[in-house]
């Protein structure tokens, strides 16, 4: 295969590529979704050129595959991202993300009085889309927050 361009982030033989992440969000996704909890090699591209959005972030995780549920949780902060499954340097499956109905054990409730801060329970939020905005409702305190507020709470 001849190419007239050079990859800015090295190709992987087998694993997951999360592409079209909004610029400045890649590191947050790595920590929020515990994508670094692996011994496998992770390659990160930040502020890469993008025809679609000007700039983007990119994450490649070797020998690791995200489930569709895990991938859809990324849609909260990277709604236009794609998750590609790579095998032998080829894309064998491409997931287009959609918002999940709920997200569990990932985010922290911004309400400091919520029991999820003091009790041994995993956080749990119902995902609601209202007039183009994403809101999260905590299962425990039942307060509703703009998803950006929850992102900043972590």
UniProtKB/Swiss-Prot annotation:
One of its GO terms (molecular function) is metal ion binding. InterPro entries: Asp_carbamoyltransf_reg_N, Asp_carbamoylTrfase_reg, Asp_carbamoyltrfase_reg_C, Asp_carbatrfase_reg_C_sf, Asp_carbatrfase_reg_N_sf. It comes from the Bacteria. GO terms for biological process: 'de novo' pyrimidine nucleobase biosynthetic process; pyrimidine nucleotide biosynthetic process. Zn(2+) binds at residues 109, 114, 138, 141. One of its GO terms (cellular component) is aspartate carbamoyltransferase complex. Binds 1 zinc ion per subunit. SUPFAM superfamilies: Aspartate carbamoyltransferase, Regulatory-chain, C-terminal domain, Aspartate carbamoyltransferase, Regulatory-chain, N-terminal domain. Keywords: Metal-binding, Pyrimidine biosynthesis, Zinc. Its cofactor is Zn(2+). Gene3D superfamilies: Aspartate carbamoyltransferase regulatory subunit, C-terminal domain, Aspartate carbamoyltransferase regulatory subunit, N-terminal domain. PANTHER family: ASPARTATE CARBAMOYLTRANSFERASE REGULATORY CHAIN. Belongs to the PyrI family. Involved in allosteric regulation of aspartate carbamoyltransferase. Contains catalytic and regulatory chains. This is Aspartate carbamoyltransferase regulatory chain. The lineage of its organism: Bacteria, Pseudomonadati, Pseudomonadota, Gammaproteobacteria, Enterobacterales.
């Amino acid at each position: 295969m001849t190419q007239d361009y050079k990859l800015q982030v090295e190709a992987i033989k087998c694993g997951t590529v999360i592409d079209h992440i909004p610029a400045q969000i890649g590191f947050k996704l790595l920590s929020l979704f515990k994508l670094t909890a692996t011994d496998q090699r992770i390659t990160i591209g930040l502020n890469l050129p993008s025809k679609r959005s000007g700039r983007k972030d990119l994450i490649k995780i070797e020998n690791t595959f995200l489930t569709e549920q895990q991938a859809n949780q990324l849609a909260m902060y990277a709604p236009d991202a794609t998750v590609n499954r790579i095998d032998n340097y080829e894309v064998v499956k491409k997931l287009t993300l959609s918002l999940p109905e709920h997200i569990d054990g990932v985010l922290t409730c911004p309400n400091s009085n919520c029991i999820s801060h003091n009790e041994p329970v995993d956080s749990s939020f119902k995902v609601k889309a209202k007039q183009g905005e994403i809101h999260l409702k905590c299962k425990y305190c039942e307060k509703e927050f703009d998803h950006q507020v929850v992102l900043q709470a972590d």
